[in-house]
Amino acid sequence: MVARRAAQAEGEHTAVALDKTAFYATGGGQPHDAGTLTVIAGSGAGQAGDTAGAARSLVVTDVRKEGELVWHTVIGEAPAEGTIVRGDVDWDRRHKLMRTHTAMHILCGVIWNEWQVPVTGGNMEPLSARMDFEFDPLPEGFASRVEKLVNEAIERDYPIEVSFLPRADAVLDADLIRTKVSLIPETVKEIRVVDIVGLDKQADGGTHVRSTREVGTFRVVKTESKGKGNKRLRVEIG
């Protein structure tokens, strides 16, 4: 990804916005990408004392979206406005998050299809996550049963498709209603849909693998009660 530095945020940390980016900003329960921005043209491409024309790289430690701008928090001095940079996403971290995010959608689909129980919340890190569901109580033998069902779904290698629907159509789709598409702000007129074909369909803005087998393996680490009608699963992807 090659982009031009467009703005700089003032504050405790150095953050820059670009005219385009391939970095995923924290949102929808998925953490941000990491990586580097390398100055390749313009002010700062080579500093005094550098070897001839040496490029300067800045480590990206956080990515946040505010309004229309995506802010990349970096270590080091921000390049001048108009500087051209190359962005390199940490693919190992990104792919682990893709696998994890898809696994969470598989889990939601399996639990709905088997028990008709909706998800109430969740959070993820690379290859680990927690998900909360409206169980009260958890069924007997739930952890081993859901682990088996999710791994079977992974092995079936369901294809994953991404599409965009007008909001007026999305809010009438039964699967999207179940996954609370109506909670998306009304200012969003086009809804991005991630469909694990034949298993689960959700409005979602995150990153995913191309088919379920790419996820790997799924393991339930722990179940917890977070109160009446709210049970938590902690899981790992291998």
How would you name each of these model-derived features?
Residues M1-G238:
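Active-/binding-site microenvironments in catalytic and ligand-binding cores
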